[in-house]
């Protein structure tokens, strides 16, 4: 039996059946619901109608008629409105295509992942192809990737419009010829002025191709030539432009002393020079003059086997403003050469003496006494360095990065000296065979350490790595 409800409407029945209680339909249109017999809401509870909905007071909302409560259309309001009439709802794009959200989201993906995500839809591609997402990245294009093979067997140069849309300012071309470079210049819309850095690796570029490239691509200020054996020193004389500020030449068999003469005379604004050439001698370094002394701040002489202390003399007198110097692999440089560096290049912040087998602890004493601004020191494979040398380095309050890979005479006692270097952020001890677990465990005192490399260290045990994870939680330990 039913009883009258609100405003005389009949109240629906509420009868238990098979342990279920059927609730009356709600005016919100959600339909009936049921509660199982075992739930606290229905157990030992009399069958009651749902409580009437609580409505806001008249001062906060306009009263609704029975027609409105029943879901029917509202009649037009009579009298003055109690508040401003809301406008139509603002339509927002779906979250998956909301550019504001996507602009923040895509920062969390790597370059490779961005390339894949750009294929999802046009909206994602439009957002991802903004140059800000690709700043600092350099596309690497191999010769075979520059052409599409047509059905007839002919080759067609690929469309580079996608690279132009992303605003790439540098490219690395691998295995290309003079013709490939000309095609690249003709087909990339930003090649004339927009490209600032070019790298050619293992390519057959000739003197003529190098000259055409630098003449056509007027924006290039950073140039790298690696493994290019078909250009000669004459090509450097005919093509190098004064606008170039960074030059790297490595594994190019025709590069010798005369190439340095061309570089020193044609590049007055050169700020960074990296040279890896087995045939360069001390004579080449004599070509540097005070003209480069004002602009050049970085010099890397990599595996220049013929350079001796005499060449170092020319460097320190001609380039007094160097802040970064690498003599890596210059195997004829001795402690006397390092003394010249320490006494004359007081602005150095980075010094690389790796693979210099004649360097001893005495060289480290010169470094510690005179290079008070030094922040990075690389001593990999300096096999004559001992604990005594590390005791000299422990006085350097500015040193932040120290590399001692494969320094086979360093022992636990030397590590104790390093524990006083609170400024250290990066320490590499990879391949040091005499370090024990006990000696390495003391490194937990360097609480500011951010990176510790211990690959190929016999004393680096799983238990030690667990110990580091507990006591150096902010440090990346490379096993």
From Swiss-Prot:
Q: Which residues carry this modification: Omega-N-methylarginine?
A: 92
Q: Which Pfam families match?
A: LRR_6
What ranges does the record give for the region Disordered, renumbered to this chain? 1-94
Compositionally biased tracts (Pro residues): 47-60, 73-92
Q: Alphabetically list the UniProt keywords.
A: Leucine-rich repeat, Methylation, Repeat, Ubl conjugation pathway
GO cellular component terms?
cytoplasm; SCF ubiquitin ligase complex
Q: Which residues form the F-box domain?
A: 94-139
Disulfide links within the chain: none
Q: Which GO terms describe its biological process?
A: SCF-dependent proteasomal ubiquitin-dependent protein catabolic process
Can you tell me where the transmembrane regions are? none
The LRR repeat units are at 244-266, 267-290, 319-343, 345-369, 371-395, 396-420, 446-470
Question: Could you tell me which InterPro entries the record lists for this protein?
Answer: F-box-like_dom_sf, F-box_LRR-repeat, Leu-rich_rpt, Leu-rich_rpt_Cys-con_subtyp, LRR_dom_sf
Its biological purpose: Substrate-recognition component of the SCF (SKP1-CUL1-F-box protein)-type E3 ubiquitin ligase complex.
How is this protein organized at the quaternary level? Answer: Interacts with SKP1 and CUL1.
The protein depicted here goes by the name F-box/LRR-repeat protein 16
Q: Gene encoding this chain?
A: Fbxl16
